[in-house]
From Swiss-Prot:
Locations listed in the record: Cytoplasm
EC number: 3.1.3.5
Superkingdom, natural source: Eukaryota
Organism the protein comes from: Mus musculus (Mouse)
Biological process according to GO: allantoin metabolic process; amide catabolic process; AMP catabolic process; nucleoside metabolic process
Phylogenetic classification of the source organism: Eukaryota, Metazoa, Chordata, Craniata, Vertebrata
Chain spans, region Disordered: 1-200, 218-238
Tissues/organs with expression: Expressed at highest levels in testis. Also expressed in brain, skeletal muscle, kidney and heart.
Name of the molecule in the record: Cytosolic 5'-nucleotidase 1B
Gene Ontology molecular function, alphabetical: 5'-nucleotidase activity; magnesium ion binding; nucleotide binding
Gene: Nt5c1b
GO cellular component terms given for this protein: cytosol
One Pfam family here: 5-nucleotidase
Length: 573
């Protein structure tokens, strides 16, 4: 060696000593760092926990800042190296690269590491801890090796019993649940509450009505309440309509249920007929008046299978049924029909004989009212009665006072052939269709004053009488046939048979009908002549009049009459 090189070497010796000491201090400093990383060539890098001066990891289950001994017992499956301490691996190539970059001469002259350092830093792969906790591919190394980072995959060397303590309550729950299931299997299965019987089940429409409107609702739903209720009501109506349609179709297919259903009372023209007006019960009445109620009931029970003979209103009721049949042919869903109600003060025990007689003649009478000796007049308005026909004049007068069109039925003295295809109804004018104001003048002042009065008030309509409403009902049904071009074949025909003179007092009558909007098919002005011969030609099913001598005259010719007890003529009869 030359002297110059020796001089340079001597000059660099202090620097070499300085570099060795710095390397030892740097190694010791790296071992004390909490962020030291384990790295091997081709393996995954994991962050290390805090270490002490000897290089062992300080483990703490709770605070992660202070060192405390673990309370859990070691597991059999755990390796011994994990139960003691984790030894930090020697600095990796990145650490040596920093020292090697100082000068190549330093690597040549640097002595090997001491044995004390080997005891704290081991590089043997046999004692190296397992770095992969899960079967996942290795992650690339961090770009900043000196920065601290926390990973979700912590080293398994932290407390090995932490997961067992967390899972123990869950295991106890599963064990208790399995025990409870096993215990329930052996126990008898009993129901703690009674089963709801099917009779208590109700559809939604009924259950909805049980709850009031006090339920709190959001403001946006409150505004839609009426519309929603309207939609629900419409849906319910559609369901009901479909149900009744299916029921009617079912009944039409059954031969025994082929009879038409009765119309709804609020639309129908209700005709209330007593049992003595519908059937001939003269002999039965004599037994009641002569022998009393008990004998009368015994007689009815004994003869309940004996069919009663037709009474004065029998043919009138048959003609009403023919009109209903014609209306149903033209209007299948028609509700403006005649509805016959049997209204009688007979007892319920007599009802069996009445039902047998009604069915025998094929009368479509579905509603009965048997009052058991009590007057049935109080039920007339409840049945929405338009016309009441009875053989008892006292009950008819009661009904007239109640404002219900009523008449007392009388049979003809001899049989007469009646038309079966057309309902024919004849009316008297004064005190029947019209009021009795004109009769007051005729009775008090004579016929001359009567004619002058009618001429003077020709354009003034007459006041209505008790049967005017029934004529309106007939006219309403007639218009239904006229709408189908059935005027000439209409099954209803009305007649006006009056003792007035057409020349002197007939104009006011016709103008009054015109003002009311009513049509009369035939108007017969007799000028005081008897009505019997005219009625024989008409052959009406019923003739309404307020004077008994006209009733008696018509009876002699066989006409079925109905006396209307209304007006001044009742005081003179």
């Amino acid at each position: 060696m030359s002297q110059t090189s020796l001089k340079h070497k001597k000059k660099n010796e202090p620097g070499m000593r300085y570099s060795k000491e710095s390397l030892d201090a740097e190694k010791r400093k790296d071992s004390d760092k909490t962020g030291a990383r384990l790295s091997t060539q081709g393996s995954q890098e994991l962050p290390l926990h805090n270490t002490d001066s000897r290089g062992y990891v300080v483990r703490n289950q709770w605070s992660r800042t202070s060192r405390s001994p673990s309370t859990g017992a070691p597991s059999v499956d755990e390796p011994r190296s994990r139960n003691t301490a984790i030894k930090v691996e020697a600095p990796n190539s990145s650490t040596t690269s920093r020292t090697s970059s100082a000068s190549p001469s330093q690597h040549e002259t640097s002595p090997p590491p001491q044995t004390s350092e080997k005891s704290s830093i081991q590089q043997t792969p046999q004692n190296r801890p397992i770095t992969q906790l899960e079967s996942q591919p290795p992650t690339p190394p961090e770009t900043e090796p000196n920065s601290r980072r926390t990973s979700a995959k912590m080293y398994t060397g932290s407390d090995p019993w932490a997961h067992r303590e967390n899972r123990e309550p869950r295991d106890l729950q599963l064990r208790d649940y399995a025990y409870s299931c096993d215990s329930r299997e052996g126990m008898p299965k009993t129901r703690e509450y009674p089963r709801t019987p099917p009779t208590e089940w109700k559809p939604y429409a009924q259950r909805r009505l049980q709850y009031g409107t006090s339920v709190d609702m959001e403001p946006e739903y409150i505004s839609d309440g009426p519309q929603q209720r309207q939609r629900q009501q419409t849906e319910e109506d559609e369901v009901d309509e479909a149900y009744w349609t299916s029921v009617s179709m079912l009944y039409e297919k059954i031969p025994s249920c082929a009879r038409p259903r009765p119309p709804k009372p609020k639309h129908a023209i209700t005709i209330a007929v007593s049992s003595r007006a519908l059937f001939n019960m003269v002999d039965d009445r004599k037994i009641y008046e002569e022998e009393g109620l008990e004998k009368y009931m015994e007689y009815q029970l004994t003869n309940e299978n004996v069919i009663l003979t037709p009474g004065p209103a029998f043919r009138f009721v048959k003609a009403l049924q023919h009109v209903n049949s014609r209306l149903r042919d033209l209007y299948p869903d028609e509700q403006d029909l005649f509805d016959i109600v049997l209204m009688t003060n007979n007892h319920a025990q007599v009802g069996v004989r009445l039902i047998n007689s009604v069915n025998h003649y094929g009368l479509l009478i579905d509603r009965f009212c048997l009052t058991g000796g009590k007057s049935p007049i109080g039920y007339l308005k409840a049945y929405l009665t338009n016309l009441y026909l009875s053989a008892d004049s006292e009950k008819v007068q009661e009904a007239i006072k109640e404002g219900i069109a009523s008449a007392t039925m009388y049979a003809g003295a001899k049989d007469m052939a009646y038309c079966d295809t057309q309902l024919r109804v004849a009316f008297d004018g004064d005190a029947v269709l019209f009021s009795d104001e004109s009769e007051h003048i005729a009775k008090d002042h004579g016929l001359d004053k009567f004619f002058q009065h009618e001429t003077l008030f020709e354009n003034k309509p007459l006041a209505q009488g008790p049967l005017k409403s029934f004529l309106e009902d007939l006219g309403k049904l007639q218009k239904k046939f006229y709408a189908k071009d059935e005027r000439l074949l209409c099954p209803i025909r009305t007649y006006l048979v009056t003792a007035r003179s057409a020349a002197s007092s007939g104009a006011r009558v016709l103008k009054t009908l015109r003002r009311w909007g009513l049509e009369i098919d035939e108007a017969l002005f007799l000028a005081g002549a008897p009505k019997g011969p005219i009625l024989v030609k008409i052959r009406p099913h019923i003739f309404f009049d307020d004077q008994m001598f006209h009733i008696e005259s018509a009876q002699k010719f066989g006409t079925i009459t109905a006396h209307v007890p209304y007006g001044i003529a009742q005081k003179r009869n």
